[in-house]
Design a protein with these regions (language model features):
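Short, low-order "capping/linker" segments at domain edges
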Residues: 223-234
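Disulfide- and glycan-decorated extracellular loop modules of small multi-pass membrane proteins
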Residues: 235-241
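Hydrophobic and amphipathic membrane-targeting/association helices
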Residues: 1-218, 241-243, 247, 252-311
């Protein structure tokens, strides 16, 4: 077979590709106003949709584990066995306490109590943000601020609904494996409330874990003193005195430390730039979909026209 014969199919293929491209560009040119019109409609629609979306702001606090360890160090290792037998907690290590605090921060009980104590039902379910005035307002169709009455069909939202609503806007990250850094953030349409709630959450979790530890230590001290009075063994009395000392240290530490579990490295500040929605992305996606759809319609119209012409 000669080389000229081998080149013939390739030449025909190139010519067919060139014809197909010319035909495609011809179709696009013939349907240019349709393509422009459909794409423009989608572009305008995506712009309107993007502008109608509520701005969401992110307030974030950066936290580190409190410096002082609640564990008793060498004393803890010496008395760990005796404390375990007596059911006495010598104080969680830093890592364990952080894990407990994060789990508590996400818990249904803690969040429910936080919402109730800070009266967050109204802003959580009826709150809105007025861009023109830069202030939070209440939706009068959901809550009557004058009479204090909920206008929803079932009245005030339930605790479960409040927990789910708050969990959706709450984000807890960490701890970082290297630094132990933890972040607490809230994404919310009201930037003032977002920053306020984050800072209150940090204070609340520190106070909550402190209260738990003090309560456990106080109960342990009372129990150990009772056991001390009942034993005559000198060695056991020495152990009880050391355990009482360890529990007393916990209560004293709690008295002098406000930042009991988390030390605030960077408190939440009022954000001035929204994180959502990403309006430019919405518009670009809208234009892309409009352009793609217009091409499909144009090709379908041309194909239908050719089919009818052949018939």
């Amino acid at each position: 077979v000669s080389m000229n014969e081998q080149q013939v199919p390739q030449t025909i293929s190139y010519e067919e590709d060139e014809i197909d491209l010319r035909e495609l560009f011809g179709i696009l040119w013939a349907e240019k106003w349709l393509i422009i019109g459909v794409t423009a409609v989608f572009a305008i629609g995506s712009v309107i949709y993007a502008l109608m979306q509520t701005d969401i702001y992110r307030a974030e606090a950066v936290l580190a584990p409190a410096d002082a360890e609640q564990s008793m160090g060498g004393l803890g290792s010496q008395l760990g066995g005796a404390a375990a037998l007596l059911g006495v907690n010598l104080g969680a290590s830093g890592g364990d306490n952080i894990s407990t605090a994060i789990a508590t921060l996400r818990s249904r009980q803690f969040i429910g109590r936080f919402i109730e104590e800070n009266n967050l039902y109204v802003p959580l379910f009826a709150g809105q943000w007025d861009k023109s005035t830069g202030t939070g307002v209440i939706d009068p169709e959901i809550y009557d601020a004058v009479s204090g009455t909920w206008l929803l069909l079932g009245g005030r939202p339930s605790e479960q609904e409040a927990y789910r609503a708050f969990s959706r806007i709450l984000s807890v990250g960490g701890p970082d494996r290297t630094t132990g850094i933890v972040t607490v953030a809230i994404n919310w349409h009201n930037p003032d409330e977002a920053a306020e709630w984050v800072n209150k959450l940090v204070s609340a979790i520190n106070a909550d874990i402190k209260t738990q530890d003090v309560s456990e230590a106080t109960s342990a001290i009372a129990y150990l003193r009772n056991q001390l009075e009942q034993t005559q063994l000198v060695d056991m009395q020495r152990v009880f005195y050391q355990l009482i000392e360890s529990q007393t240290r916990i209560t004293m530490l709690a008295d002098v430390r406000e930042e009991y579990v988390f030390k605030v490295i960077d408190p939440a500040s009022i954000p001035d730039v929204n994180v959502e929605p990403r309006r430019s992305v919405i518009v670009i996606v809208g234009i892309f979909i409009g352009g793609l759809l217009s091409l499909v319609i144009a090709l379908f119209r041309q194909k239908s026209g050719l089919t009818l012409a052949k018939k």
